[in-house]
């Protein structure tokens, strides 16, 4: 007999951003003159840069001719793109990351959700609070959490690390040792950024305890300060072989 993954039943309702969209839509209908500042889902507000438009047009034109037509890309992504990422996003910042360690995907949301599948269901998860919902929801569906606690409005069995004004909206090392630590900087949703010194403390902690940090740097392009790392690999020991 076919059964369902009952972990899905722990989720309290719809995806957070769908709920927000529904509430905004209802409010607009009741208040058509109101100006709404959308600070929920991070939708884009500006047109694509000319360089991107030119590249898209050029790529479409290539697909119109037999000599330049391309079928499926390699499973890990085009080599020229991986080489460019390795050089510009990593090596130019002193990170020892080579092209064969880079995988082209459809974005951080999918990767954040998919990477947890390689870990066992008995791993303890730590997340910032507030948190990007994907980190928690995917682990709920994988069976790494307890039930949803309506009173606390969070899930039992998850280590929540409060990010408050009093601690600069940065998580502090938890008392309970986690196995998987989700960090996102610049942070979604708070916008807080972490210094290289503070991030190094997390890397050192993970190496001491054997934890794995899942680091989401989707918003690194907003960084302008020199003491704010664009990648966790700017920290010593972030790669496992550097520690061992």
List PLM regions with ranges:
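N-terminal small-domain helix-loop-helix segment of the aminotransferase-like
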Residues: 2-106
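Conserved core of the PLP fold type I
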Residues: 66-206, 220-239
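Generic enzyme active-site microenvironment
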Residues: 214
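Walker B catalytic acidic pair
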Residues: 217
